[in-house]
Amino acid sequence: MNWETAVSFCDDGIVSSDAIVGLLSDNLRLGNAQAALAERYRRMQSLYPNASADDPRWWQDGCTIADPRSHWDVLLGIPRNVFGADNPTWCGTGGILNCEDVGIDLPTWMMRRNANPQIRIMVVAEEPKRQGLGTGALWVSSPWAFHSMEYRNHSRNPRMRTIIEAFMQDKEGVVYMTDIRKIYAKGTAHRGFDGTYRSILDCEIELFNPSVLIGYGSTVLDELRPGLSGHPDGAFARLVCHRPYEDLYNGVRTLVFAHPSPLNASLGCVASNVINENPGITREEAIVKYYTEW
C-alpha cells in the first residue's frame, strides 16, 4: 500500500481533532498550549502525504522543531513560555517542564482513502518515550510517528507499519492510535495524572466508538485491569505468549498483546508458539500473524 496516496490521515469526519485537543487540554491542564496542539493537528493533516522532516512548514510560531537529522519524527517543542507562568502544573516549582525529555503523543487515526470501513480498531500503546531533549519544553509527536513521511518509510520498527497496514487493508478498518499514559518524563511515564489517564481513554472510546480495543504491553493491562497482569513482567509474558488476553472494557471487545517492540525478548516465545502451529513461516511472519489474526 502506498501510504502517501492511499491513506486518509486524521480526517475530522472520523474523529474531531478539536475534540481530542480539548479533551487533552482540559484533563492535563495544558492551558495556553492548547492552541499549539490544535495547530499541530492542522499541520499533520496537511503535511502528512509528502513533507520531509526538514520542511519549514512544520514550524509553528513560538515553538521549535527537534533537529530533523536525528529526529525524523518531526518533534514539535512547545516551550515553557507558551504555557504561561500562571500554569503551576507545568511551569511552577516542581512543574512537569522541570523534568527532562517530557513528551506527549497526539492520538491519530487512519484508514484507506475512500474506503468504507467495516471495523473500528482502537490501538492503545504504553507511553510517549523521548530521549536527549533536555528540560523546559513539551515534545509532541504521535504514536509510531506515522505523521512523518520519513519516519514511517524508514522506521527502526517496520513491524508496526505492517500491522497497522493489515488492520486498514485486510480487516478493512479505520485505526485510532493512542497511549494509555499520556505524558512521559525522563525514565518513566509522568505519574501526576495517574488517576486521569483511564478517564481520558474512556472519553476517547466515546469519541471513536471502537469495535475492538487492541492493547500492547503490561502497562495497558495494568491500567485497564489493575493488578491482573502481575509482576514481574514475566507473569504478563506468560499470560499473552500464546494468544492475547481477551476481556471486555466499557463493553468493547479488548485484546491485550505482548508489546511489539523489537527489544521485547518475550516475542521469541510468541514466535515459537505460532511457528509450531504454522510450520515453514519465518519468525517475523509468525510475530505479525500473532498481532493481526484475531
What are these regions (language model features)?
Residues 234-273:
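Short, flexible loop segments at boundaries between secondary-structure elements
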Residues 226-228, 270-275:
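Generic alpha-helical propensity signal that fires on short helical segments
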Residues 2-214, 218-227, 260-265:
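A polyanion-binding, active-site-adjacent surface
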Residues 221-240:
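Active-site-adjacent alpha-helix immediately C-terminal to a catalytic or transition-state-stabilizing loop
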Residues 275-294:
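Histidine-centered active-site loop/cap adjacent to the catalytic His
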